Amino acid sequence: MLQIFILAAVAIFLFWRLRAVLGSRDGFEKNIKDINASKKVIKSPDIIEEPSKVNPHDDIFDYVEENSKSAEVFKKMKEFDSDFSVNKFVSGAKMAYEMILMAFENGDTEKLGPLLEHKVLKSFTSVIEKRKKEGLVIEAKFIGMRDIRIIDASFSEKTKVADITLSFKSEISTVVKDAEGSIIEGHPDEIKKQKDTWVFTKDLSEKSPIWLLKSTL
């Protein structure tokens, strides 16, 4: 019995010695918090980050060289017409190209009318009428656009008329049939590569957003 009391007394003595050396768990956690608090980064108040400035001519440089003649022309266009955007123009020209090309191939003069200048419309209509007289029918399908690039641009500060020349590379499928419906040229599954250079024109002083096809080169 005496031996048990002695062992118990030794155990209590060792416990208190360890507590004195190592410290309590609560004290350890408190020290960690103090250390973490000392590591906190002090941020300067009232610092506002200014948003990066956007270059109003970025859309120009997406398509032409920064110091090129065309770049200077586009800057003048934007100075006169703040709504003008090279990105929007190219996007619209892409759609117009497909519409005009397919309308011409399929002989749809009604669709061509609002998109062409008078001289070009007259030329296109003449070719379409000639095909009809010969009994030829063209069935065309637009496959897709491979490339579109701005070749040149001009703007008259006097007349406010702008001309933009673009190069198009596309893929189409065309079949030519005679009056009896027999295929005399092409194949429905044959895809041809098409390359065109077109000039679009617009009076920037007018409210109409439509650019007309001025010529084909």
Can you say where each PLM-predicted feature lies in the sequence?
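Short alpha-helical basic/polar micro-motif
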Residues: 3, 16, 110, 198
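Feature marks short, highly hydrophobic, charge-poor N-terminal signal-anchor/signal peptide-like helices
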Residues: 1-8
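Structured, amphipathic secondary-structure segments that form assembly/contact surfaces
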Residues: 111-217
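Juxtamembrane and targeting peptides
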Residues: 5, 14, 19-95, 176-180
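Polynucleotide-recognition surfaces of large bacterial nucleic-acid defense/processing enzymes
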Residues: 11
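Core segments of small alpha/beta cavity-forming domains
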Residues: 55-143
